[in-house]
Regions:
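Histidine-centered catalytic micro-motifs
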Residues: 162-167, 198-206
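Short acidic, glycine-rich surface-loop motifs adjacent to enzyme active sites
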Residues: 41, 45-46, 151-171
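Extended active-site neighborhood of metal-dependent phosphoesterases/phosphodiesterases
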Residues: 51-151, 179-195, 209-246, 255-260
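Hydrophobic beta-strand anchors of alpha/beta hydrolase catalytic cores
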Residues: 3, 39, 109, 160-161
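N-terminal active-site segment of His-dependent metallophosphoesterases
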Residues: 1-55
């Protein structure tokens, strides 16, 4: 079976460059051409609220994706609920809950949600940007959700693909990721390849790693790389139109992947792009590598891997 996946589109006209209707159409047309059974994103799809875009435009963008003639699915990222209440986002995204699963052509896709802060022993979901107040407490997966994942994997009679915004593989990923990895290893000992692949977005990086017999795919942003220290080399007139342009390295194309699953063989067909005006992170006052030692690239790599 084959599906299309992208991440971190960051639709916010006038704030970010990229994440446009044209980008969405590009992803859709490639999915149609490749025969993808569905399209899914790994979070940070759209920024709502008046500070980003009028409600009607924000909702229209979401509905454009929802109403494609290929099934579409959402996964929550940290920014999806920055300016729109969680309950409203779930309604607009047509999600049954913050976590859910579906089966497609012999595989189970499990969308889980580590968008929680752990504060005084309580797991508090991200909502209206609350996590900005407690950054050290973010990126936790509640134990109840780990148990839900265990049950959903145990009940599957097929390989499972796990998708979330934050990472189970990166050292700067989900805080209690080892508990989840231990659970995955337990399930794979009981039933080989119970969990075949784990996909995350969020970090705007491109990396593939096999960890304990599971393929972990750190999926790049479809739109840009974020830089903390602004770059002052963009044209002034563009910066006046796109507020956070100086804080981004823009990709010229909506990079994403089409993934084919055949038994335990995973084929990732990525794509290469380039950066707007040829501007790279090395031209700015920002470190070239991130906390996991990964460079920014305007690319989603391609690979064919059989897990044994």
């Amino acid at each position: 079976m084959k599906f299309s996946i992208f991440s971190d589109l960051h639709y916010a006209p006038g704030v970010f460059d990229g994440g446009t209707y044209e980008d969405l159409d590009f992803i859709y047309k490639r999915a149609k051409k490749e025969g993808s059974s569905f399209i899914i994103h790994a979070g940070d799809f759209a920024h709502g609220g008046d500070v980003y875009s009028p409600d009607d435009d924000y909702e229209n963008f979401i509905n454009t994706y929802n109403n494609l003639d290929i099934p579409t699915y959402h996964c929550l990222g940290n920014h999806d609920t920055d300016n729109v209440p969680l309950e409203k986002v779930l309604e607009l995204y047509k999600m049954p809950d913050v976590h859910y699963f579906f089966d497609c052509e012999g595989y189970r896709f499990i969308i889980y949600d580590p968008n929680y802060c752990l504060i005084d022993g309580e797991y508090v979901h991200y909502d209206m940007g609350n996590y900005f107040k407690t950054p050290e407490a973010r990126d936790w997966l509640p134990p109840s959700q780990i148990e839900w994942m265990r049950k959903v994997i145990e009940e599957a009679n097929c390989p499972c693909i796990l998708i979330s915004h934050a990472s189970l593989e990166r050292p700067d990923g989900i805080k209690n990721r080892q508990s989840v990895l231990d659970m995955i290893n337990e399930q794979n000992k009981k039933r080989p390849h119970a969990v075949l692949m784990v996909i995350n977005g969020h970090y705007h990086r491109d990396n593939i790693r096999i960890l304990d017999g599971v393929l972990h795919f750190d999926l790049n942003s479809a739109s840009f790389d974020w830089i903390g220290k602004p770059y002052n080399g963009y044209p002034k007139e563009l910066c006046e139109k796109i507020r956070l342009l100086p804080n981004t390295i823009i990709y010229n194309d909506p990079i994403h992947a089409v993934i084919t699953l055949e038994g335990t063989t995973i084929t990732i067909e990525g794509m290469k792009s380039s950066t707007f005006m040829g501007i790279g992170r090395e031209m700015t006052e920002n470190p070239y590598y991130d906390e996991a030692g990964r460079p920014v690239t305007a690319e989603v790599q391609s690979a064919k891997i059989t897990l044994h």
